[in-house]
Amino acid sequence: MPQNEYIEQHIKKHGRRLDHEERKRKREAREAHKISEKAQKLTGWKGKQFAKKRYAEKVAMRKKIKAHEQSKLKGAAKPLEDSGEALPAYLLDREQANSAKAISSSIKQKRLEKADKFSVPLPKVRGISEEEMFKVVKTGKSKTKSWKRMITKHTFVGEGFTRRPVKMERIIRPSALRQKKANVTHPELGVTVFLPILGVKKNPQSPMYTQLGVLTKGTIIEVNVSELGMVTSGGKVVWGKYAQITNEPDRDGCVNAVLLV
């Protein structure tokens, strides 16, 4: 490997930070604010150059949007039967409707139906900062090291979960804040059942919190609904189904969720 690629070498050897994706997302979100600040504060030659660059970017974006809209408006090609000219083999399918367009439209429609099917009760939730989520744990003989973190929210860990050795465990999930069951409400039947949690599907705060199994408001969890006796159209018993947490478990001490049907 060349000498100047030491950063790539370090990434391959040690990997990235645990919060790399979150930092990248925040950096990208700040870009708009930085551009706005530059547009307001830059003066003179630098201001002119910046305005020229932004103008070129906006023109390119408008052209791209216009081209995309034009491609949507174009339908099937007109048949050329009246011309009386013989067509080569590779142009014979021009008379038929554009199959690729039809397939694309059907895929989009299916996605919309799927999104409607799995629409959640809480589409937006409050963001949680890392300072609120993690508590710094001081370690070492003189308590000067602070690389350990303890999660302050309720979490879910699987059945066969075992903690890492104490000296290697970076993130601690306290036993007192672990949840195994949830109060799940069926929206159509109007009944609430105490069901075991199978796993955490998606935490809206961060992919890292999903991996750690953190249970916060708006989290999608998978619960065991075999007790409800739900069956599929084929007659098979439904084992697991998704539900969304509607309360704040760290305040209430329990997990309340609504089944996604």
Curated annotation (Swiss-Prot):
A motif (Nuclear localization signal 2) lies at residues 51-58. It comes from Eremothecium gossypii (strain ATCC 10895 / CBS 109.51 / FGSC 9923 / NRRL Y-1056) (Yeast). Its main location: nucleus. GO terms for biological process: maturation of 5.8S rRNA; maturation of 5.8S rRNA from tricistronic rRNA transcript (SSU-rRNA, 5.8S rRNA, LSU-rRNA); maturation of LSU-rRNA; maturation of LSU-rRNA from tricistronic rRNA transcript (SSU-rRNA, 5.8S rRNA, LSU-rRNA). Pfam families: Ribosomal_S8e (PF01201). It is found in: Nucleus, Nucleolus. Belongs to the eukaryotic ribosomal protein eS8 family. Ribosome biogenesis protein NSA2 subfamily. Residues 18-39 have a biased composition (Basic and acidic residues). Keywords: Nucleus, Ribonucleoprotein, Ribosome biogenesis, rRNA processing. This is Ribosome biogenesis protein NSA2. One of its GO terms (cellular component) is nucleolus. Involved in the biogenesis of the 60S ribosomal subunit. May play a part in the quality control of pre-60S particles.
